[in-house]
Design a protein with these regions (language model features):
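Proline-directed phosphorylation-rich, low-complexity intrinsically disordered regulatory regions
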Residues: 22-39, 43
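Long mid-to-C-terminal scaffolding/interaction modules that assemble large complexes
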Residues: 68-155
Length: 155
């Protein structure tokens, strides 16, 4: 799945470059899932747009960019899967929860009394107790994951 997403992203990048499109340079950081950067920019522009007067040039430009680059919503789906996985059993990772995390793009490593869940890249690793000590553990972990992974969160 990750390889397919990477190839699709390269295809869209080549297609956009050939068409002379694109208003920013992506940089060296690769997307972890399809349209991640697009959704980040869409979220930021949507939130900043309201800071400008409606009839201003900045507002008009932002509106035009948002219309030309619609939100894909992949991040929302990822967060929804993580939420389902972590809040259904108080944070305990049963088979169903693990399957949802894997579907969301996480890998799960078992070791000792904790799981290590990694979102595509070792920089985005979270530790989960195999037996949660309190009922809020799943909600706390969800909050931590949102802070790190959610590119559409409110700024």
């Amino acid at each position: 799945v990750a390889e397919r997403d990477r190839l699709r992203e390269q295809f869209y990048a080549i297609k956009a470059k050939a068409a002379g499109e694109g208003f920013f340079r992506r940089g060296k950081e690769q997307e972890l899932y399809l349209n991640e950067a697009n959704d980040l920019l869409y979220s930021i522009l949507s939130q900043v747009k309201i800071k400008y007067p409606e009839n201003s040039r900045a507002s008009t430009l932002i509106k035009s960019m948002l219309e030309a680059n619609p939100r894909a919503g992949a991040c929302e789906e990822i967060i929804k899967l993580v939420q389902e996985a972590l809040t259904s059993n108080g944070g305990k990772l049963n088979k169903t929860a693990k399957a949802k995390l894997i579907e969301a793009g996480f890998s799960i490593e078992e070791g000792g009394s904790h799981y290590k869940i990694v979102f595509h890249d070792s920089r985005y690793m979270f530790t989960v107790a195999k037996t949660p000590s309190e009922y809020r553990e799943g909600k706390n972990l969800l909050s931590n994951i949102r802070n790190v992974v959610d590119v559409e969160r409110k700024i």
